[in-house]
């Protein structure tokens, strides 16, 4: 019995000693406490060692754009690290060239704060704010697209430029597609593909970016066009649906939603050149924002055309609004193209893919398509097809502006 007691005693003593050794080593090898991060040579923040730079900035109300929520894939959270950032990581090299890296460009979501740092961020970051908004409405405008309207707190406004975007946050959640409020006229395909059985289970907070559909004079609100991201056909049990789009589709009037912004690069140039807008799907959002801003706020007299592609009339939205703008503004024309019109549509307008319609019905006989400015947002295949068509007819790449968010 004595031997057993002694054995237990010595074993416990050894374990306790090892714990103290490990804790002592940790105190020597692992830095703790806070360090200073100097931003733009003006503002200093105190940051816990081990934080990601993106998170540290957000904790100090400096919201750097990050459409992927810090996953290192969107490359929007770029900052310049002038001192203290360590070596650039392999995860950053696919987004940052050697020349840019030599200038200190880094992805803030990939930079771990280990020592005092000096960084430079875009001035617009200092104007980015965060709000808790209230859902005013969340209606379908197409089979798989919602128009989400958020009300800002009383007296608040997002000071944005047309073509800008916000980031929306979602907490961990569980939802069933069967709980979505889908209007009766849009349920046919949901029934056909039995989408009601899909569920979304999200265990960690997420952030995504969405272009705004409202324009700056529509104050006090944020309007988004959001397409639901469903799993590939036959993969419903193994591939999850879109994290943020499922969350948004499940929102009801009165729900609270946290957003931050404004951000943006997809802005109209201040020239007299003709503007050609091309959109499809949820890419309608920045198109609406730009066109409304040009015609209603700026009273622009620039020549403008808008080419929007949809499958059928059911998938086309804001038709009455654009019809009214066209009637009231002689410098603006808009054209709808349907790729798969339904018999009940009685469609006599343009049919086919929008890049072909744009070329055959307009640019083919345009006296100088290379002198126009092109603004586009839509599904990836549409974007690629339009860009290639424009390059083929001699348009410089610098005159092709693309918003990758809205599709």
Curated annotation (Swiss-Prot):
Superkingdom: Bacteria
Query: What Gene3D superfamilies does UniProt report for this protein, alphabetically?
Result: 3.10.20.30, Nucleotide-binding domain of ferredoxin-NADP reductase (FNR) module, Translation factors
Q: How is the cofactor bound?
A: Binds 1 [2Fe-2S] cluster.
Q: What class of enzyme is it?
A: translocase
The keyword Translocase appears for this protein: yes
Q: Which residues form the FAD-binding FR-type domain?
A: 128-269
Q: Coiled coil: which residue ranges?
A: none
A GO term from the CC aspect? plasma membrane
Identify the PROSITE patterns for this entry: 2FE2S_FER_2, FAD_FR
Membrane topology per record: Single-pass membrane protein
User: Where do the 2Fe-2S ferredoxin-type domain residues begin and end?
Assistant: 33-125
Family annotation (InterPro entries):
2Fe-2S_ferredoxin-like_sf, 2Fe-2S_ferredoxin-type, Beta-grasp_dom_sf, Cbr1-like_FAD-bd_dom, FAD-bd_FR_type, Flavoprot_Pyr_Nucl_cyt_Rdtase, FNR_nucleotide-bd, NqrF
Q: Pfam families from the entry?
A: FAD_binding_6 (PF00970), Fer2 (PF00111), NAD_binding_1 (PF00175)
Positions that bind [2Fe-2S] cluster: 68, 74, 77, 109
Q: Where in the cell is it found?
A: Cell inner membrane
Its EC number(s): 7.2.1.1
Transport: is it a keyword of this entry? yes
Span-the-membrane segments of this chain are: 4-24
An example GO BP is: sodium ion transport
Task: Write down the required cofactor(s).
Answer: [2Fe-2S] cluster; FAD
HAMAP family linked: NqrF (MF_00430)
Described purpose of this protein according to its UniProt entry: NQR complex catalyzes the reduction of ubiquinone-1 to ubiquinol by two successive reactions, coupled with the transport of Na(+) ions from the cytoplasm to the periplasm. The first step is catalyzed by NqrF, which accepts electrons from NADH and reduces ubiquinone-1 to ubisemiquinone by a one-electron transfer pathway.
Q: Which NCBIfam families match?
A: nqrF
Q: How does it assemble?
A: Composed of six subunits; NqrA, NqrB, NqrC, NqrD, NqrE and NqrF.
Family per UniProt? Belongs to the NqrF family.
Official protein name in the record = Na(+)-translocating NADH-quinone reductase subunit F
